[in-house]
Each structure stands twice: as structure tokens, then as C-alpha cells.
Amino acid sequence: MACENMFHRDPHNGHIIDSVCADPEEFNEYIDMVNSEYLVACLDLGHCGVTNRDAAYCIRKMGGERIKALHVHDNDFVNDCHTMPMMGEMDWDSITKALADINYSGNFTLESDGFFRGMGKDENILLQALKLKEAVSRKLMRDIMNNKSR
């Protein structure tokens, strides 16, 4: 079972505000308090961005002993766009370095459904988009591995 860092919007002004486990220290407290082999952290990297947190800092603060799953996507730090990595404002060089530093070996879920919005249903275009997502994922994985060997 994985718990995820979350946010919500203030109902009065629409601003993004913290929700459960948005803060990495709080997230650590919850995981450590339950102290169960069945509860792990799923760090949503895009949620780090929209809550004005540095994803690399969150990764290092939580460590590989807690983080066993990632939701990997990019955004503009204003909206939870769920677009493909390297198409927004996230710093993927520092993220892949941090993942290497904690020797990350968990799940890597590319959660970039927003990348497909507006593409229509043309199978050739969708196939090319999927191939691009695969190439970006492979690049991120290579970057993590290359940083581990340094």
C-alpha cells in the first residue's frame, strides 16, 4: 500500500495548498509512525512542484527506505498538468541525481496523461506520442543509472 503526497485547492481563492503528506517531514512521520512493511511512500514529483517544493530535496529528505513508488510527470508549478517530463518547469537533472543518491529502485510510473490532451484519436499521432514518452522514460532511467556510477 502506497501513500501519496497530496494537495488541494482553497475553495475561496482557488490557490493550491498543502494536503496530507505534502511536506516531506510530515510524510516521513506518517510512514514511520505506522511502521509497517506494507506501507510505503509514493512520491508524486509533480505534486512537489505545485506545492512549491523542490522534488530533489523531497527525494533526499525521504530516502530510498521510504520511497518505493514514484509518479513521474511535469508541470508549470501553477497547475497539476500531468505532462511529460522535460515539457514543464521541473529540474530533471537534479531529480535524477537525487534518485541516484538514494539508490532508488522502486516503481517508476509515468503519470503524464495530460500530454495526450488535444491530440485526438489519430492512431499514428498517438503511437508517435507513446514512442516519445518511452524515449523520455529511457533517458531519465539512463540519467539515474549514470549518476549512480559517479
Residue spans of the language-model regions?
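Active-site-proximal beta-alpha loop/turn segments in soluble metabolic enzymes
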Residues: N5-D18
